[in-house]
């Protein structure tokens, strides 16, 4: 899930990841839960941020634990981050910082073939296109 607000996006990091690596937020759908409800709940649990305008982006099969990853964009309704217990860090990244991490600092973002990376790249390109 890529949460955005203007020219900033919300990314998080797990303690087990390599130093400085950040990615989109992620989670699982609970039984009986709508996908949009899962996005809203997971973002709230991991960051304290409320979201709106949840939009489906795409999917990717994931070998472990034999899952289907679904990518969504969501617009932030609130901006104040409340750190939880699930992630080591969650923070807002400016589009210029995000673009630099995508292009220059390998190992700081998810692998090229992941839906998380595709979400981040698509968001950067969209924000830059709006500025032209």
Regions found by a protein language model. Give the residues of each.
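Active-site-adjacent beta-strand/loop module that shapes the phosphate/pyrophosphate-binding cleft
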Residues: 60-82
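Nudix hydrolase/Nudix homology domain
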Residues: 18-22, 83-132
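N-terminal strand-loop-strand
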Residues: 1-24, 50-51, 74-76
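Acidic, glycine-rich loop-and-beta core segments that form the ion-binding/anion-interacting portion
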Residues: 39-48, 56-61, 66, 89-92, ...
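The catalytic Nudix box helix
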Residues: 24-57, 72
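Short, well-ordered turn and helix-capping elements at secondary-structure junctions
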Residues: 13, 28, 58-60, 78
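Hydrophobic pocket-lining residues within nucleotide cofactor-binding pockets
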Residues: 29, 51, 76, 87, ...
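Short, contiguous acidic/charged loop-to-helix segments that flank catalytic cores in large enzymes
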Residues: 27-31, 60-63, 103-108
């Amino acid at each position: 899930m890529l949460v955005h607000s203007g020219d900033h996006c919300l990314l998080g990091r797990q303690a087990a990841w390599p130093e400085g690596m950040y990615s989109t937020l992620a989670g699982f759908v609970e039984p009986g839960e709508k996908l949009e409800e899962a996005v809203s709940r997971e973002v709230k649990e991991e960051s304290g941020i409320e979201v709106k305008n949840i939009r489906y982006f795409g999917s990717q099969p994931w070998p472990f634990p034999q899952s289907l990853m679904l990518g969504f964009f969501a617009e932030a309704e609130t901006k104040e981050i409340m750190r939880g217990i699930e992630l080591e860090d969650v923070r807002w990244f400016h589009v210029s910082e995000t673009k630099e991490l995508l292009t220059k600092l390998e190992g700081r973002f998810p692998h090229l073939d992941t839906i998380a990376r595709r979400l981040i790249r698509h968001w950067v390109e969209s924000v830059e296109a709006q500025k032209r």
